[in-house]
Amino acid sequence: MTKGILGKKIGMTQIFDEAGRAIPVTVIEAGPCVVVQKKTVEKDGYSAIQVGFEDIKESKLNKPLRGHFAKHGVKPKRFLRELRLKDADKYEVGQEIRVDIFQPGEKVDVTGISKAKGFQGVIKRHGQQRGPMSHGSMYHRRVGSMGSNTFPARTFPGKKMPGRMGGERVTVLNLQVVKVDPDRNLLLVKGSVPGNKNSLLIIRDSVKSK
């Protein structure tokens, strides 16, 4: 990974290309971010930068975080994330990272926390087929068979069962950058990204782009 930025999901809309085709896009408020800390191979064993996004009152931070920002001379930020970059040496503490590091046509990977759905059954959670809905059926939306009785006489680990759905870290790969608006710190990517509106996103250059 050579570049990355933090952002906030605004929502989805559509724009039209030169041929008049509608393109579904997600609008992301990306940056500006500030480099809070640098990590080097000599001192930390790996190369990375710690970036902060979105200003916050100092009174809302705990004492260790207040000291962390004061030590590096950076204004307090709401979000802190670490980006492991190959060329972290070119960044300096206090340097601002803006959305114009990306250009239209590039491919990016977007990471976020998926929408939480609460406790759900196997049909919604895993896409399983329901049972017969006719009269006399013993089940409709139940799990079905969970294993044999005599052998192995247990349910194998990993069996798809009802449970809490969503609220997990999800990365969507190879999304195309459609438009960049540096004046308003907006990044438009083709397709959908995980998370609710105003949720935190990590945008990085694609690692598997062809």
Swiss-Prot record:
Keywords from the UniProt entry: Ribonucleoprotein, Ribosomal protein, RNA-binding, rRNA-binding
Parts forming coiled coils: none
The UniProt record lists the keyword Transport: no
Gene Ontology biological-process annotations: translation
Highest taxon of source: Bacteria
Pfam families per record: Ribosomal_L3
A Gene Ontology cellular-component term: cytosolic large ribosomal subunit
GO MF annotation list: rRNA binding; structural constituent of ribosome
PANTHER family to which the protein is assigned, alphabetical: 50S RIBOSOMAL PROTEIN L3 (PTHR11229), LARGE RIBOSOMAL SUBUNIT PROTEIN UL3C (PTHR11229:SF16)
Family listed: Belongs to the universal ribosomal protein uL3 family.
Function: One of the primary rRNA binding proteins, it binds directly near the 3'-end of the 23S rRNA, where it nucleates assembly of the 50S subunit.
Assembly and binders: Part of the 50S ribosomal subunit. Forms a cluster with proteins L14 and L19.
HAMAP family, sorted: Ribosomal_uL3_B (MF_01325_B)
Protein name, UniProt field: Large ribosomal subunit protein uL3
